[in-house]
Amino acid sequence: MAFDGTWKVDRNENYEKFMEKMGINVVKRKLGAHDNLKLTITQEGNKFTVKESSNFRNIDVVFELGVDFAYSLADGTELTGTWTMEGNKLVGKFKRVDNGKELIAVREISGNELIQTYTYEGVEAKRIFKKE
């Protein structure tokens, strides 16, 4: 499938502002912007496995399209929600457990790049990954 493969973060757009809006402190924002995140994505039908490895943690996230699941961000923020496929995009709609506010994440492929767009409280950020 299109998302399958290993993707290494190449650059960010407005990511620190996004993290600030999320309430992440300045030290964690600086570190988070340079986390060397790598995603290894495997799709089997409607089931996805995403291995996240960074300077801070290594975790496996397993989800099925349309099925609610819980997820914790690297800073400990807890979310619940679902991923769905909308055309050629993976769209994640999540709610923060602590305040009920919505976080939207969209993953799409453009050439040899995976573009991950986040939207929270009107602030949009992108993380662009290159396929290894």
Curated annotation (Swiss-Prot):
Outcome (variant: G45V): Small reduction in stability, impaired ligand binding
Stretch forming the signal peptide: none
Positions bearing N-acetylalanine: A2
Outcome of mutating G66V: Large reduction in stability
Tissue specificity field: Expressed in the small intestine. Expression in the mucosal cells of the ileum extends from the midvillar region to the villus tips.
InterPro entries hit by this protein: Calycin, FABP2, Fatty_acid-bd, ILBP, Lipocln_cytosolic_FA-bd_dom
PANTHER family: FATTY ACID BINDING PROTEIN
Protein task: FABPs are thought to play a role in the intracellular transport of long-chain fatty acids and their acyl-CoA esters. FABP2 is probably involved in triglyceride-rich lipoprotein synthesis. Binds saturated long-chain fatty acids with a high affinity, but binds with a lower affinity to unsaturated long-chain fatty acids. FABP2 may also help maintain energy homeostasis by functioning as a lipid sensor.
UniProt family annotation: Belongs to the calycin superfamily. Fatty-acid binding protein (FABP) family.
Record note on domains: Forms a beta-barrel structure that accommodates the hydrophobic ligand in its interior.
Annotated hexadecanoate binding sites: W83, R107
Lineage: Eukaryota, Metazoa, Chordata, Craniata, Vertebrata
CDD domains, A to Z: FABP2
Keyword hit for Transcription: no
Name of the protein described by the UniProt record: Fatty acid-binding protein, intestinal
Pfam families: Lipocalin
Taxonomic source organism: Rattus norvegicus (Rat)
Effect of V61N: Reduced thermodynamic stability
GO molecular-function terms, A-Z: fatty acid binding; long-chain fatty acid binding; long-chain fatty acid transmembrane transporter activity
Result for mutant: G87V: No reduction in stability, impaired ligand binding
GO cellular component: apical cortex; cytosol; microvillus; nucleus
Annotated residues for binding of tetradecanoate: W83, R107
Induction: By peptide YY.
Record key words, sorted: Acetylation, Cytoplasm, Lipid-binding, Transport
Documented effect of changing N55V: No reduction in stability
Biological-process GO terms, alphabetical: fatty acid metabolic process; fatty acid transport; intestinal absorption; intestinal lipid absorption; long-chain fatty acid transport
